[in-house]
Amino acid sequence: MVVSNDECFRSGRPDHNWAAAPLVLQRRCLLRHLVGLVGLGSLAAPAAADRLPPLCGSAPPPAYPAADKPALVQSWLQDGRQDGPLPDCGGLRARDFELLVRITASYIAPGDLDTQLSHFGAVSHLKGASYWSYSDRKRLVLFHEAYAVDQPGTLKPRADFSAAELRSGNELYFVHSDNRSSTLSPYSLRLVQSSADAFQVLIENVTDLRYLGMTLVAHHEMQWAVAIERLGAGRWGYRSLLGLRHLHLGRAEQHRLSNLARSVAMFDLLAGRQTDIEGYR
């Protein structure tokens, strides 16, 4: 159902019985109003996006910056900003993305490779993590709740995953709620590659992510690959590639900034930093 501005205007006039308007019209008009307030723009990505070439290419990743240098942050929109040659999406399960965000960095941390892997299993540590909000122009708490679960259909907490559980190759699950939604959303976590000096994990949403009853990200349309590589004694290379297959609600640029901020926040949590990302606009 497409709702015009005129329909919403007529329904909201004093001489119109708003309570008698169809419930679906009330809901769509409210959503249109709220979307306008928060600056998300249109309710769907342009249909022309379906005809644009894919974002995934074959360009090799850039070199790691030094551990005392800022992370290299790049993003690609199918019909917008593109920071360099199209990246290789080999770590993701799909290639038909409308948005890609890549983080390349290095950091100093004690421990061996399993210690670094165990950080990804410690999903309860996401709770309270902060990020830079482009819309609010300040740091906010990103995750209000986060914990591991045995199955995506249950909300019963369990202990964080160990490195051994990740190395089993099984698909593991966790839930979290963020600062934009109080709903606990389930995600999958799986070790997809491993060697003596490196590993790669893949994280996906296993159910639709929704806002006011509207789909923001359909199930498995958010894919996030993270690779860690040993570079030397206590020095680790970090590469992540986040892909969104369809931008269902809001302006593409809003999606880009939001997911860029979240991607950087995940690296910051691992590396113990607070990266200044305002300049990445």
Language model features with spans:
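Hydrophobic/aromatic beta-strand elements that line small-molecule binding cavities or substrate pockets
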Residues: P186-Q193, Q223-E229
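A short acidic/glycine-rich loop-to-helix N-cap element
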Residues: L212-V217, L242-S263
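N-terminal secretory signal peptides
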Residues: M1-A45
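Hydrophobic ligand-binding cavity/cleft-lining segments
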Residues: P53-S181
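Short, highly charged C-terminal tails/helix-capping segments
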Residues: T275-R281
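Compact beta-sheet-dominated globular domain cores
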Residues: A218-L231, W236-R245
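Generic short beta-strand segments
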Residues: L202-L209, L241-G243
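Short, hydrophobic/aromatic-rich segments at coil-to-beta transitions
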Residues: L166-V175, A196-V201, Y211-L212
